């Protein structure tokens, strides 16, 4: 290790640790926002799906090699029943948003496997690792790209939405967009705007999920940066509740209302606002707190029933089906190395060779 960094860490150790531990929140404030509730399981038949995705990549000077996959697993009280799984390996040219494109593509596969499994049979809840709100907030600012495509072809968005409605467990954005407009755009413009089209494809699937199965959807996040409850805290709400409460229960819920970009409302045939009930929960004493988002405005009794339902499958404070889904899809470094060897990319430069 570089000596000056060791010296700096030693000299500033107390200051750094103080920042790591500082909450700037009174414990009483956290407890006042926390509702004690001990979830109780039940004996009736119950089926739940769990969805997670994974990504990994290797960067080269001329492209990024990436791999993504997603799985939706169906569980009942008797255990595992079945799964829907898909994935993709590909190359993307360098661009300022290349990693965001990979994340969007992973999201498409997650949403499509979720929809596919729900439509295959009856289930009570569909758990998804992540946040609906985080994705929807990032849609702001895509109107300019949409207008650009409409200027190229006034019927572009209508053609595009119709094309991506194919029931395939695949990413259709680039193929369908280039079928409509060709590849005559400036490369930088095309690469940057392709992210918008991938976001539209993901949103299109999410709208189907919200419209048809909104009451069953539950997004669960193990991490969050939101400070909606404690706006002056250095730490996010999730960390505050995790550190300052120990009982099972949940935070007083917030209702979040979001609007779709105006340029998309007509094409997606979904003009109303999207409402989500957001809260933090702990399912077992002294286990971790996680963030929950459910579609629509929910009552306290709805939330308690949801926690009762989740407790049926909870192991060490977390829904086991989501833990199993994560284990199924995780793409490790050795997996990427194997793909690299299969593709025989040995002669492609990664840009760090001159440092060796």
PLM regions and their residue ranges:
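Long, contiguous domain-sized segments
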Residues: 1-42, 46-47, 106-356
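Generic alpha-helix detector with strongest preference for long hydrophobic helices that associate
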Residues: 51, 94-99, 187, 191
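Acidic/glycine-enriched edge-of-secondary-structure segments
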Residues: 87-107
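Acidic, metal-ligating active-site segments
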Residues: 55-94
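Two-metal-ion RNase H-like nuclease active-site motif
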Residues: 46-56
